[in-house]
Amino acid sequence: MWWSIVGLGGSCFVSSTDKRTALKGYQVWEEGECRAWCQHNSEKELAREALIYKHLGEHPHILHCYGLEEVHPGINSLRLEYAPFGDVRKFIREHKAAPLTKGVRLRMALDTALGLSHIHARRVQHCDMSCRNLFLFDNYRVKIGDFGGSLIEGQDELRGGVCEEAAYELPLRGREFWSRPARKRELFALGSAIYEIMAWASPYEGQEDGEIEKKYAKGEFPTLEGITASNIIQMCWDEKYGSADEVAEALRALIASQR
């Protein structure tokens, strides 16, 4: 793999040559040479993601996007803020034996809830909330990114195939797949993100997606015994919260009680 590539998604590379900004695109062009490419032309998807970032605007817990940049005639990439510690999931897996302090992890959870609150205030659905789309910065501050599958409410329809990963997906609970409330889906996923941060492991880590889906369908969730913020996580999973603001307030109260 080319040296500047720091991430790889389904149809895009993320590369950085200066460790200050990153380029997300389906071709990596450097010094007039195409160093890597995906077969799928992602111009439309990148333009949509740029539009979502512009719609969201500036926020301390949203990854900053500088817009589309032509890297070669007719070839565009997204210029993004560079996350020095990568995504939260990768960081957790690389530091499995040395978790961050409980206080730092609670603040990471709060950052995530505040970012999602802003996303919802701007009437955007992320549609793929997970720790692999949370990015870690200096002092372990978190910003939400990767809006490739997101939509603006009232302007877009949810596309088939766009959904959360198994451990982050709200069970049907007697509903049709597409009839689950969008906010409840995202708040359930927020609960799983908080779990992953506080437990320092993803829900049912290492198990197959199908097995996780079966357990969730039966109402079986990972044990929360001994995990800080267990009540908040459980309430997210039980659909007890009406907004990310409520989750953020609960986390603030918990942080204050720990002092």
PLM segments and residue spans:
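AlphaC helix of the protein kinase catalytic domain
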Residues: 88-100
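Conserved short submotifs of the Hanks-type protein kinase catalytic core
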Residues: 73-87
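Short beta-strand micro-motifs within the conserved protein kinase catalytic domain, predominantly
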Residues: 64-76
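Helical subdomain adjoining the active site within ATP-dependent kinase catalytic cores
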Residues: 2, 200-259
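ATP-binding glycine-rich loop module of kinase domains
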Residues: 2-55
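Activation segment/activation loop of eukaryotic-type protein kinase catalytic domains
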Residues: 132-175
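Catalytic-loop of the protein kinase fold
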Residues: 116, 120-137
